Regions:
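Active-site environment of divalent metal-dependent phosphoester hydrolases
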Residues: 5-8, 24-25, 55-59, 76-81, ...
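Core dinuclear metal-dependent hydrolase active-site scaffold
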Residues: 1-64, 124-127
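Residue-identity detector for threonine
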Residues: 23-24, 42, 46, 54, ...
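Binuclear metal-ion centers of metallo-dependent hydrolases, dominated by the metallo-beta-lactamase
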Residues: 1-9, 85, 89-127
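Proline-aspartate-enriched helix->loop->beta-strand connector
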Residues: 66-71, 75-98
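Short, glycine/charged-enriched secondary-structure capping and boundary segments
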Residues: 30-31, 63-66, 83-87, 110-113
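Broad hydrophobic/π-residue packing in well-ordered secondary structure
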Residues: 39-41, 48-50, 77, 101-104, ...
Length: 127
C-alpha cells in the first residue's frame, strides 16, 4: 500500500494507509516523506491508528475519530516525548499506547498528557 490507499477488507473492516516520515533535519533520511506508512484499521465501529515510524507530521490533522492510537517515541527514528504529546493532542484518541520507546523516559508522555481528559495513556512493556 502507498500513502492514502484504502483497502476494504470486509464489510466492517477497512485499512487506510497514512503518511509516516521524519521531519527533523538530519533524521529525514531514516524515513523519507512519501515512502512509509502508518495505518488506520477500522473494525466495526472501532478505529485504531498505528503510526509507524514517524514524527508529529502535518498530516496528523487528517487523522480523526481514533479510539486507540499507537505512537512511537524514540528519537532519532520516531517522535520525541514532546512530539508524541503534540501528536496526541492533535489526534485526541480515547486510548494512547506509546511504543518503540526503548530507553526513552516514557513517563514524560504520561506526565505531559495528565490534563487531557479525553485520552487515557496506557504504558505497557510491549515486546
Amino acid at each position: 500500500m502507498k500513502n492514502s490507499d484504502v483497502l476494504q477488507l470486509a464489510d466492517d473492516m477497512k485499512l487506510e494507509a497514512v503518511p509516516a516520515y521524519n521531519t527533523t533535519p538530519g533524521r529525514d533520511k531514516f524515513h523519507p516523506k512519501g515512502r512509509d506508512n502508518g495505518y488506520i484499521l477500522t473494525l466495526g465501529g472501532t478505529r485504531i491508528y498505528i503510526a509507524g515510524d514517524t514524527e508529529d507530521i502535518p498530516e496528523l490533522n487528517q487523522v480523526k475519530d481514533i479510539d486507540i492510537a499507537f505512537l512511537p517515541v524514540n528519537q532519532p527514528y520516531t517522535m520525541t516525548p514532546e512530539q508524541a504529546i503534540r501528536a496526541t493532542q492533535i489526534i485526541k484518541p480515547h486510548i494512547l499506547y506509546p511504543y518503540h520507546y526503548g530507553n526513552t523516559d516514557i513517563n514524560k508522555v504520561k506526565e505531559g498528557l495528565k490534563n487531557e481528559k479525553t485520552t487515557e495513556v496506557r504504558i505497557r512493556a510491549l515486546q
